């Protein structure tokens, strides 16, 4: 038994086997002892060092492998968590889109809202039937998103773009009003007297008044308080003093020109037509330059001591004009012409009711009265009935245009539309507003009277924007009574409501009211009163694809087209200072 013990001692320990890679290549059946490795080795120290290095390398390899596995495990964990969170967020968006909530009350309210909306949803026909249906769905979805996002404490009106209610360009606030600053010496008006009977509506008459003020200064003449011509289109007998404050007008401009209420008695008995002192629009070219007045009008004034301009629509050029005369033009428009208290008080009441409980409101000047529609020579989808009606109106109110259409071949209605020469219809206007992002609950004030097509066309607007109102809806019968049968005075209420609006949208940039209102908002707005000026040619190109274009594409294209009109720039040469007052004559650039 004692002789078998060495065999037990020679049995190798597990840690001395080939795990460390130091076992000699001999019999696989009987492993070497832990001392065998030194047997017959001429350099045992090198062998020990080599084994240690291999053991260290093996440890390092194990640690690297464990680290790599740990890193992969952590990355996998984060990927899993990230996937889970994204899936939850996606589900949350779906819930919000559909108006769903874990709160059963929200689900019930959403269902009730959907049922109510479906009952009210209008069936659209005509050219823009498809687009109006898409707009209705988009506005309804936006309304549900707003309502149920508010239930989750999300921001109100989050779907509206930032620049809807403010000027997108900071440069707009750098321009400040300064037309009230004077350097002119007082004028005695010794060359005679100038009278004017301005035609058109209230806004065209306003432009004529400021232009005649400049002509009076140019000719060193005294100005008689202007008179307004009775128009068979506007059918309003209002005179200057019924709309504007006469005393303020005379006093404010007294350092610039001499203003009197009537001709001296010795001149009142003159037959002005007989002596050649009556000058009509036929005799004065549009946008006549100062030289014309000095050459042709001044000699008559010096001879007869009085000149009477009849019509005087856009009969003074914007350029070239001396600096102080251009500033006088701005001073008249922005400072001297104040509405009478009766108009101001009623307009203030109108604006107060529009704002309600501090809410914003959008003013939309829908220039779509029959005179504009007939004069445009465009077609608006009314078939033969529309064509006969507009032809009849042209014969009565625009006889020269009616005669011209029979004798001369004009561009077709389709060509006029593609060139942006047709006023936007109510349908096109409401599609523009919806595409820009104004939500369904926006309060919209519509300026204008007797929209062509009547209540049927306005119904399209109210179906998409139920909070749409007019002055007739907001003011009581007794409050409107003093202005009935006075279209110019009613237009003055529209002017003030549009000028004070948080946002103003026009449908025809050639409209005098839109031009004057947009200029007023620039002059007094401090860069905080945005105006939407559609480029009708670009908008027409987009609307021509109404049968195929998708709503999201329509939105992008409309927003891009409107964004391009919002650049802040100084008045281009030859353009109206009433519409573009950002010039050194009217405003000062900080």
Curated annotation (Swiss-Prot):
GO BP: fucose metabolic process
Stretches with biased composition (Basic and acidic residues): 1-16
Region ranges (Disordered): 1-26
Single GO molecular function: glycosyltransferase activity
Functional pathway: Glycan metabolism
EC numbers, comma separated: 2.4.1.-
InterPro entries noted in UniProt: FucosylTrfase_pln, GDP-Fuc_O-FucTrfase, GT106_glycosyltransferase
Protein topology in the membrane: Single-pass type II membrane protein
Binding site for substrate: 365-367
Keyword Membrane part of the UniProt annotation: yes
Pfam family, one: O-FucT
Similarity comment text for this entry: Belongs to the glycosyltransferase GT106 family.
Protein name (record): O-fucosyltransferase 2
Native species: Arabidopsis thaliana (Mouse-ear cress)
Source lineage: Eukaryota, Viridiplantae, Streptophyta, Embryophyta, Tracheophyta
